[in-house]
């Protein structure tokens, strides 16, 4: 019996639909970075505005992580899910039709809104249906990585072969519309499978040690994850003086390793406790982070990139599973969790940028060691907390 064998027909349809939506989330995430050079070339915008466009997407995502929890209570999970997912279409259309800075910023913000709310809802729905099954959560995350691998090529092919980057936006908008239709067919919330916690407005989850440990872990992880993804091309270009093709290839290699790692994690997640699995991944991340920032040889650097991708791959989903029972119990726990943890993805890359501006990328990238060490400490505390609960 496969990973989904224990679920009924309606549950399988929901999980399969969320896999597709997570694939789209991967596309949305990488399309932001892939579209900016095309938008800059088309509309002649400045580097400052280009940076603001990327930030607008991140800010929109963080804000909607919290707002989406309240809109689900007010509108119902399905209606809120569909309406907020539709914002990605609004955002893609906005950046397609005009080079007006305000419209571009609004478009990227809407894309961020859709990413934040859709990720929140999808994780919560699958977490509730599977009762925090780490294998299913990791398999869903693998679809995100697959979408992330494909997105840059979709924009590149559209711009080079079809002659217009806008075709990529049109295609992704149609794919998003299909995702909304699939959600309409799902039976959850008020018309089927129960999702969300019983305690709708209760904030007592803030008193739970497991919640804070999981939050600290995801804060450190997202800081490492977004920093590696965001700075890897610049790091290889400037620290190793490689070609753009080689540096871009390293970014693709990183995502390929993440994809393979998530598939592996989905297969072995049930063979050990979630806390211990997170600890093992944290150890691997610490080791390969140390190798990554050491700059010994280019060969070791490439190996460290692969190693980081493999060990980063399953941590995110497992940390969500670690706090899964709390998410099921408290309606607002998911939203606050994603909002607060999102600051890790904002602060860490910015700190690296500030240090790199003064001392070079070789020094700035070493900030990753602090986050990796902190994640390892938090993972050890998490294992101890579980052992204490067992006794």
Q: What are these model-derived regions, one by one?
A:
Residues 32-33, 209-252, 256-259:
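Extracytoplasmic gate region of multi-pass secondary transporters
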Residues 44, 76, 97-102, 131, ...:
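Helix-breaking motifs and short loop linkers at transmembrane-helix boundaries and internal kinks
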Residues 63-102:
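Conserved MFS/SLC helix-loop-helix module at the cytosolic interface between two early adjacent transmembrane helices
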Residues 64-76, 261-273, 356-357:
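Helix-to-loop junctions at the C-terminal end of transmembrane segments
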Residues 107-142:
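Cytoplasmic helix-loop-helix junction between adjacent transmembrane helices
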Residues 117-130, 313-327:
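Intracellular juxtamembrane helix-capping segments at the cytosolic ends
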Residues 132-133, 139-188:
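Helix-loop-helix hairpin linking two adjacent transmembrane segments in secondary transporters
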Residues 272-319:
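C-terminal transmembrane helical hairpin of 12-TM major facilitator-type secondary transporters
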């Amino acid at each position: 019996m496969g990973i989904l064998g224990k679920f009924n027909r309606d549950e399988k349809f929901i999980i399969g639909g969320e896999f597709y939506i997570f694939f789209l989330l991967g596309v949305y995430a990488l399309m932001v970075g892939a579209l900016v050079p095309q938008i800059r070339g088309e509309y002649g915008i400045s580097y400052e505005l280009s940076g603001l466009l990327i930030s607008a997407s991140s800010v929109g995502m963080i804000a909607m992580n919290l707002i989406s929890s309240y809109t689900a209570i007010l509108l119902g999970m399905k209606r809120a899910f569909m309406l907020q997912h539709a914002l990605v279409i609004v955002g893609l259309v906005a950046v397609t039709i005009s080079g007006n800075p305000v419209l571009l910023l609004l478009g990227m913000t809407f894309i961020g809104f859709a990413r934040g709310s859709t990720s929140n809802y999808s994780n919560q729905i699958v977490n509730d249906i599977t009762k925090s099954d780490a294998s299913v959560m990791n398999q869903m995350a693998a679809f995100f990585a697959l979408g992330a691998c494909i997105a840059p090529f979709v924009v590149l092919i559209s711009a080079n072969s079809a002659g217009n980057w806008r075709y990529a936006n049109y295609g992704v908008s149609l794919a998003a519309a299909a995702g909304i239709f699939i959600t309409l067919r799902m039976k959850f919330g008020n018309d089927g499978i129960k999702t969300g916690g019983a305690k709708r407005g209760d904030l007592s989850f803030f008193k739970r040690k497991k919640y804070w440990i999981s939050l600290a872990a995801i804060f450190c992880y997202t800081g490492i994850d977004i920093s590696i993804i965001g700075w890897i091309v610049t790091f290889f270009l400037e620290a190793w003086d490689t070609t753009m093709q080689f540096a871009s290839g390293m970014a693709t290699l990183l995502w390929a390793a993440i994809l393979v790692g998530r598939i592996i994690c989905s297969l072995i997640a049930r063979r050990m406790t979630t806390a211990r699995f997170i600890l093992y991944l944290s150890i691997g991340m610490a080791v390969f982070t140390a190798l990554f920032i050491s700059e010994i040889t280019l060969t070791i650097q490439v190996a460290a990139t692969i190693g980081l991708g493999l060990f980063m791959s399953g941590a995110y989903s497992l940390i969500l599973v670690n706090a899964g029972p709390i998410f099921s119990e408290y309606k607002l726990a998911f939203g606050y969790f994603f909002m607060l943890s999102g600051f890790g993805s904002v602060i860490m890359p910015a700190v690296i940028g500030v240090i790199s501006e003064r001392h070079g990328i070789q020094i700035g990238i070493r900030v990753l060691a602090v986050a990796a060490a902190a994640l390892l400490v938090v993972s050890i505390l998490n294992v101890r907390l579980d052992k204490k609960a067992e006794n």
